[in-house]
């Protein structure tokens, strides 16, 4: 049956109320092509119906027989209904004032940043800035982040964010293992490091043979460790002078990592000045809500000598084709997509949006504003200390920035009860102690409530705050020897935008430089840049989700946990697995967790020797990097001429490693954009040799509702919630089969446990990036089972339409039976380079002149473009992209035929900035109009790249990763 145009339905009368109720209206907003457009595209492909196309694309042997079993979410909700249902869950959470600390603090998000960054699609729908010319705004904001971190830590260079403080500390451990003394495999963790950090470090250390020791900081120098982790200030609040200890560790041949509070560093001597080699931490308290644990931007800063070993993104300064300053991601050869199992990290997605928020918090407040906030926090902590001492309590720590640990003896339970009555959370620091960590949001009234609680338990009257304040010396709790004297945030960007008008215009100027989904399609293969709907994003900023501490008592987080349970069951239904964990806070972390689960399974069966991971040659670089992190040996399986796993080679290698085979990692549909016909056979071969099947969920957007990895042989997968399930570039996974469910990650340090057999924590918070999980919940609730399947089918339709239209101009490298692809296609530009000298990079840069972000370049095959349009793009937008690609092919043909010079042509000089096109001198043989307006549609809506082509080689040769002086832009 053909799809019927909605106008025909509307003309039928009478219509009932049931027919007029718009429960599935969201699906029509999310799915770009309407019924008429879909039929036109199907006609182009030679299919009568969408169902017929899907039957031809997906192997019948793996098709899902039943509708997605979504239970109460099978029927779609309208946007209003879904928001109301989620609001009901959010209202079950109790927003207490949390003084728990432990790395998480309440904070004020400046409204100008909330509205113009966090809630602005120009910022949250953008992709990783691999195409620098159309990412200058985000790159500048991230460069500000790097400058902020480097200044505050006192170290030479910082990266552009990591996932959370605990994983950043684990990354620092492996960094120091690479550069440290070879005779040691010991990493020493001081006993006042945050407990969740220690647990993540232990998880990371075990599979790679690092021995983690923990004890008093004073014993660190004698531990013969290649690295030592210190907390500054300590978890209990102490501010210790570690200068002599750092010298002793260095003298013993070790290196020092410091986990430092970013706000405290505005008033405390930075770790780089007292001996730290690496600093890590969390920037959450710089304006990013707690969000039940995330997402937040962690940081890492290092001494200059370690910059090429540092994991994560690194923004650097270079010049463009006209010699003007331009920003780009530097030293990319360190990253997993290039170095694979030899990479320094498997970090694929950094916390860019949250890093931008934190950097803008510093820009808005400036050095003086930040110091004022820090001094106010410290003053409130000092007044609290004075008050409780007046009431007869003793503090464990005499020095502190914002945290007190208090001896409360037999009054402890009573104190917690009094606090609960005032809707206050104190840290449970044992049976006879409580902890209190104050923050930017703590007011005089809050301080009065805290003092009243301690007074009640003591049977006394709370002291007067003004009297305490009058009798208190300036900054009595900060050791004078550790007072910060060095300047920070001296660059003009941190000293100019302090009025809201200036800040608003600065943010607008940056977002105008970038190309995000709010301007045009981002057809990146393997990235699924689909709609992040506004109604999905709205709940992220609700205080009932944002102001919840990750270690808040369970009775305060009922709504969160109910929502998470529902989302886990939704994902179980979509994947065909038995259980899902949402703790991993990135796809790469999901991979890593999944492989650790596989290892735990083998270990439970007395087969811990199984450590070989088979990985197809076409795999994404995170696969071998994650396998290496999980302590596995990578054995590459060949692919055949059609891009499929070579079955003969797989059989040979599975047989050769039958005794020690742990797993195979496959992507489905394949990284080549094809539903491999023999995926069941692949799974059966590996299972026959005792291995487990890891199905990379990066391409789940081609499977939802149509097939499921848990049903065709997969044992474990990670899910990229930021791809298939609409979270802006974020994280997800893993899902596992029934025999692996008991091994899903725990977080024992905070009391979160799925079972005694679970692996250790892989993220700092029990539920990872919890505050963005409502996005996926909303998406699934508003789509329902039928429309989720329709979205998958439309993604496949859109990809095949592009492949069909472009095939006469660019060969489609891989396809399945009937010449069909899955949800993405690979265009082969290698013959073009041979015939014209035009490279895939030239085409990518030229697309910017047409107003498009390039498809994925040279992955998985060098010299190709991988195109993934997603279901969210309309036929009109697809046709605009197709027209641009055809026009570019015509420009290439002009070079091939000698009508255009091989060097002086619009592709080689792309992209063209407004400054270049309007300059007095025009040195090119082609016209200004051809440079800037190659198609007529650009006249009405033109995006101008802010810089010319970035010089990558210059940037890496002359590495500079700090803010650029204004004079350089003159």
From Swiss-Prot:
Molecular function terms from GO: glycine binding; glycine dehydrogenase (decarboxylating) activity; pyridoxal phosphate binding
Any one annotated GO CC term: glycine cleavage complex
UniProt-listed Enzyme Commission number(s): 1.4.4.2
Cofactors, names only: pyridoxal 5'-phosphate
Classification via Pfam families: GcvP2_C, GDC-P
Catalytic activity: N(6)-[(R)-lipoyl]-L-lysyl-[glycine-cleavage complex H protein] + glycine + H(+) = N(6)-[(R)-S(8)-aminomethyldihydrolipoyl]-L-lysyl-[glycine-cleavage complex H protein] + CO2
Coiled coil: none
TM ranges: none
Keyword set, alphabetical order: Oxidoreductase, Pyridoxal phosphate
GO terms of biological process kind: glycine decarboxylation via glycine cleavage system
Sites of N6-(pyridoxal phosphate)lysine modification: 723
Chain's role: The glycine cleavage system catalyzes the degradation of glycine. The P protein binds the alpha-amino group of glycine through its pyridoxal phosphate cofactor; CO(2) is released and the remaining methylamine moiety is then transferred to the lipoamide cofactor of the H protein.
HAMAP family, alphabetized: GcvP
Family designation: Belongs to the GcvP family.
Summary of subunit composition and partner proteins: The glycine cleavage system is composed of four proteins: P, T, L and H.
Name used for this protein in its record: Glycine dehydrogenase (decarboxylating)
Source organism of this protein record: Burkholderia pseudomallei (strain 1106a)
């Amino acid at each position: 049956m053909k799809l019927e145009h909605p106008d025909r339905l509307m003309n039928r009368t009478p219509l009932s109320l049931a027919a007029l109720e718009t429960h599935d209206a969201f699906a029509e907003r999310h799915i770009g092509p309407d019924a008429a457009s879909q039929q036109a595209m199907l006609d182009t492909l030679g299919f009568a119906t969408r169902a017929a196309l899907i039957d031809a694309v997906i192997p019948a042997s793996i098709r899902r027989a039943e509708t997605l079993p979504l239970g109460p979410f099978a029927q779609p909700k309208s946007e209003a209904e879904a928001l109301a249902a989620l609001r009901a869950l959010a209202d079950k959470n109790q927003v207490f004032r949390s003084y728990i600390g432990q790395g998480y603090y309440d904070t004020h998000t400046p409204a100008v940043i909330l509205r113009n960054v966090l809630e602005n699609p120009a910022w949250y729908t953008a992709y990783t800035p691999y195409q620098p010319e159309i990412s200058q705004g985000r790159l500048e904001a991230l460069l500000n982040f790097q400058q902020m971190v480097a200044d505050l830590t006192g170290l030479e260079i910082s990266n552009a964010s990591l996932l959370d403080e605990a994983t950043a500390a684990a990354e620092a451990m492996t960094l120091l293992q690479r550069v440290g003394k070879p005779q040691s495999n010991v990493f020493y963790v001081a006993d006042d490091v945050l407990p969740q950090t220690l647990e993540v470090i232990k998880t990371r250390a075990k599979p790679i043979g690092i021995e983690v020791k923990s004890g008093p900081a004073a014993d660190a120098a004698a531990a013969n460790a290649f690295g030592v982790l210190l907390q500054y200030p300590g978890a209990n609040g102490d501010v210790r002078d570690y200068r002599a200890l750092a010298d002793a560790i260095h003298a013993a041949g070790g290196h020092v990592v410091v986990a430092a509070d970013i706000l405290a560093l505005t008033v405390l001597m930075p770790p780089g000045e007292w001996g730290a080699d690496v600093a890590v931490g969390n920037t959450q308290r710089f304006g990013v809500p707690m969000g039940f644990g995330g997402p937040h931007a962690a940081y890492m800063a290092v001494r200059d000598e370690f910059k090429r070993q540092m994991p994560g993104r690194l923004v650097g300064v270079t010049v463009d084709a006209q010699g003007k300053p331009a920003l780009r991601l530097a030293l990319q050869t360190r990253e997993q997509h290039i170095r694979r199992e030899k990479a320094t990290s498997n970090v694929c997605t950094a916390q860019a949006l949250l890093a931008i928020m934190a950097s803008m918090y510093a820009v808005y407040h400036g050095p003086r504003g930040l110091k004022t906030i820090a001094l106010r926090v410290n003053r409130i902590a000092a007044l609290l200390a004075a008050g409780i001492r007046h009431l007869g309590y003793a503090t464990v720590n005499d020095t502190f920035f914002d945290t007190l640990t208090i001896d409360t003896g037999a009054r402890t339970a009573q104190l917690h009860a009094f606090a609960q009555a005032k809707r206050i959370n104190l840290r449970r620091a044992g049976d006879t102690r409580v902890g209190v960590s104050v923050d930017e949001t703590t007011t005089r009234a809050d301080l009065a409530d805290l003092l009243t609680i301690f007074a009640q338990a003591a049977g006394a009257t709370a002291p007067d705050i003004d009297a305490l304040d009058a009798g208190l010396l300036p900054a009595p709790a900060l050791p004078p020897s550790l007072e910060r004297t060095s300047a920070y945030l001296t660059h003009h960007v941190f000293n100019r935008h302090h009025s809201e008008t200036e800040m608003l215009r600065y943010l607008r100027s940056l977002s105008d430089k970038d190309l995000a989904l709010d301007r045009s399609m981002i057809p990146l293969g393997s990235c699924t840049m689909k709609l992040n709907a506004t109604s999905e994003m709205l709940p992220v900023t609700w205080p009932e989700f944002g102001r919840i501490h990750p270690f808040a008592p369970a009775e305060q987080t009922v709504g969160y946990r109910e929502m998470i349970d529902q989302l886990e069951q939704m994902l179980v239904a979509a994947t065909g697995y038995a259980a899902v964990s949402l703790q991993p806070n990135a796809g790469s972390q999901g991979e890593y967790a999944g492989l650790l689960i596989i290892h735990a399974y083998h270990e439970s069966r007395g087969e811990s020797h199984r450590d070989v991971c088979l990985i197809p040659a076409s795999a994404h670089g995170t696969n071998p990097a994650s396998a290496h992190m999980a302590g596995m040996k990578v054995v590459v399986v060949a692919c055949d001429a059609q891009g499929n796993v070579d079955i003969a080679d797989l059989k040979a290698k599975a047989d050769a490693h039958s005794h020690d085979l742990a797993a195979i990692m496959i992507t489905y549909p394949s990284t080549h954009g094809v539903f491999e016909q023999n995926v069941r056979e692949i799974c059966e071969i590996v299972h026959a040799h005792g291995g487990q099947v890891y199905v990379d969920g990066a391409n789940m957007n081609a499977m939802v509702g149509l097939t499921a990895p848990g049903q065709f042989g997969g044992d474990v997968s990670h899910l990229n919630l930021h791809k298939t399930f609409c979270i802006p570039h974020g994280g997800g996974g893993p899902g596992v089969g029934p025999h692996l469910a008991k091994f899903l990650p725990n977080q024992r340090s905070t009391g979160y446990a799925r079972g005694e057999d679970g692996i250790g924590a892989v993220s700092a918070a029990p539920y990872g990036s919890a505050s963005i999980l409502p996005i996926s919940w909303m998406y699934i609730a508003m789509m329902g089972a039928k429309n989720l399947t329709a979205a998958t089918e439309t993604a496949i339709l859109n990809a095949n339409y592009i492949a069909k239209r472009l095939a006469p101009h660019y060969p489609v490298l891989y396809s399945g039976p009937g010449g069909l692809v899955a949800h993405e296609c690979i265009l082969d530009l290698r013959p073009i380079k041979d015939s014209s000298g035009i490279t895939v990079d030239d085409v990518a840069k030229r697309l910017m002149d047409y107003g498009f972000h390039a498809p994925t370049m040279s992955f998985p095959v060098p010299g190709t473009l991988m195109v993934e349009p997603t279901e969210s793009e309309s036929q009109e937008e697809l046709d605009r992209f197709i027209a641009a690609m055809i026009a570019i092919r015509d420009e290439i043909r002009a070079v091939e035929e000698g009508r255009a010079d091989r060097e002086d042509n619009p592709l080689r000089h792309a992209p063209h900035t407004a400054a270049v096109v309007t300059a007095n001198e025009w040195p090119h043989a082609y016209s200004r109009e051809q440079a800037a307006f190659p198609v007529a549609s650009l006249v009405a809506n033109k995006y101008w790249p802010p810089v010319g082509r970035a010089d990558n080689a210059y940037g890496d040769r002359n590495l500079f990763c700090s803010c650029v002086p204004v004079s350089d832009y003159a």
